[in-house]
Amino acid sequence: MITTAEILKRAKAVSRKAPLTTEQKNFALAKMAESLVSATDDILKANALDVEKAKGTITDVMIDRLKLTPERIKAMADGMLEVAKLPDPVGTVSDRTAHKNGLIIEKTSVPFGVVAIIYESRPNVTSDAAALSFKSGNVCVLRSGKEAFGSAFAIVKALKKGLTDCGIDENYINLIEDTSRQSANELMTAVGYVDLLIPRGGKGLISACTENAKVPCIETGTGICHIYVDKSADLEMALNILDNAKRSRPSVCNAAEVCLVHKDIAKEFLPLLYNRFNSGENRVELKGDSGVVEIINVTPASENDFDTEFLDYVMAVKIVDCIEQAVEHIAEHSTYHSESIITTDKASADYFTSAVDSAAVYVNASTRFTDGGEFGLGCEMGISTQKLHARGPMGLKELNTYKYIIKGNGQVR
């Protein structure tokens, strides 16, 4: 097994090479996508072993996150091809100033260098992160969780073949083979080798990285996403949005976890919500505050339920007196990911979008749209819930920093 230290040395060495052209990167992405599809059988075999080992240790919903199919692998390859079609951010001049002495000052996008990604049980993150890192001019160091390691290893093997097939150093994409906490800690403290660290996973992983990292770290959020049903809401629309935001894929970070309902419509709306979530497949367990349990027969919610990312068919429900109370609740319990208001009142919509301090704020739409693909970014590196550098879905532009390039003809000061 290659040590983490050796992988980081190789990655840093590659990051210092002459940059690849846009044409080289796009051709390589196409080759990697082709290689990924060609390796479908090997990837599925590795994934089947991962799934078998994980059964009984993680929930069925998380098993779905872990499981790959030929269709999902094809979607991963298609995602790489979409990244190839996107504009190359490297070398983009975002600001240009002509000094009175003739100097030309250009603010120019450049790669970070080595980007490390620590993630858990989602094999598709492997190809998404590799594609975005590569197109944005970075070298990636991937550290998968143990549940998905076999799948990640097979995926990286295919991607490396795609690189070597077009004569590009395979060490642009690297996978840490040690899935222990020690390897994660090594990445967090690899000053001089890791230029940017991005954790993708649960609250524990993200907290560990933000608290212990000595390298620059972007906090990608857990998703305690709220949907507020205003007193003026179209109730059928609200039901459809809540159904989608909770049941379409509950294990992802943009799924809704909390529903806030205005008191004026609670007696009419809550029975409708209860009936909707108790019909069809994948019924949703509702946990309600004291006002909710007086109207519908659901489990009483604890205070902790409003601070829980369930990642399952469970939702906490609370009645609020007014929109201001809804916003106050969100401010207290949100992870600053995605929130939505269902309303027909423009003043309420404007107040909500202004007052709620999250990365994505919706009006009359599902929180499930907070996604790089849906936002036109191709795939995504993660959803940043911080305010510095990047916020919301992180695409190619967010994987570049900038430098000032100053051109003169002999000026001195």
What is each residue range found by the language model?
Residues 85, 94-232, 236:
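Rossmann-like NAD(P) dinucleotide-binding subdomain of oxidoreductase/dehydrogenase enzymes
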Residues 27, 323, 328-413:
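C-terminal core of ALDH-fold dehydrogenases
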Residues 20-26, 90, 166-173, 249-255, ...:
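Flexible, glycine/charged-enriched surface loops at secondary-structure junctions
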Residues 2, 120-140, 158, 162, ...:
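ALDH superfamily catalytic-core signature
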Residues 13-20, 260-261, 312-321, 336-341:
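Short, well-ordered beta-strand elements within core beta-sheets of diverse protein domains
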Residues 1-105:
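N-terminal Rossmann-like NAD(P)+-binding subdomain of aldehyde/semialdehyde dehydrogenases
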